[in-house]
Amino acid sequence: MKRTNYLIAALSLLLCMGSQHSFAATGGKKKVKKEMKMLTPTGSQYVIVKGKNLINPDGSQLYIVGTNLGNWLNPEGYMFNFRKTNCEWMINLMVSELAGPDFAREFWQAFKDNYITEADIAYIAQTGANTIRLPFNYKLFTREDYMGKNDETEGFRMMDKTIEWCRKYGLHLILDMHDCPGGQTGDNIDNGHGYPWLFESEASQQLFCDIWKTIAQKYKDEPVILGYELMNEPIATMFSKELQAEMNAKLEGIYKRATRAIREVDNNHIILLGGSQWNGNFEPFNDWKFDDKLMYTCHRYGGEPTQAAIQKIIDFRDKTQLPMYMGEIGHNTDQWQADFCKTMPT
């Protein structure tokens, strides 16, 4: 049996916030003078939102630096270097056809137990990172078949050990529902069927809210968790402008509905809201006051690595006076990524 080489995508995460620390295009030449001042503890054991900033319990400002644990709980074909077999259900079908369903179940169990281990979390912490983003599929919290199981407790088993590793090595954790009921993107990344049915299906929307409430009930008192990222990259760009606009108009309402469900059991954690069209379009949002612990999140994979290229995102952050979190960058040259990392923080 040939071994399968696993490719982990380590995507830099940086939080860009604060009036004088905002996506400054310094190119590494201009330095920001930082004043020494006494810290005032927040009185909370959780990271909190204060204007455009995140504040640690000790009163210090938190600048997120870290990585995604992509492909672990949401397998994506391109991370295996597959061309057309590009999501979990396709990979599962391929393995089952080649080696049988029993082997497929064994494969997925071995994959989950070995793809990310405590040693990986220790290494991430050693690099100077302070945060990990954990993408996951909603099916880990249902009886639907997924990665060789149909056990609604599997998601908690995987999250529990990740939380303990993060606690041990001093890392924050963001829970990212990368694959939502019905599919929220309409592309392979949501493990769906080519259309964001979440925006058409009441049953999918209710399940989406119910799962987030279940997760929040479990982790409401867990300070390792920085926040809940409700969905990843909703509404892709391959649909018509009219259809995109129709679904964009529903996005904020679904976010509000899920937030209300979470707040029934958890008032401690931050809610992260991604823009539509690859987490890049924030025009659908009109009400950023519906909760007092909100943070928006964006992604960047192309264009110039300059401040001008992300000025619309900066302007939205400044208008809302809320933090903006760069959740993913990558798929570019090393030089582009190095230049963009200089653009974001100061």
Model-derived segments and spans:
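Bacterial Sec-dependent N-terminal signal peptides
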Residues: 1-31
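Feature marks short, surface-exposed loop/turn motifs that line or immediately flank catalytic pockets
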Residues: 71-73, 138-142, 181, 234, ...
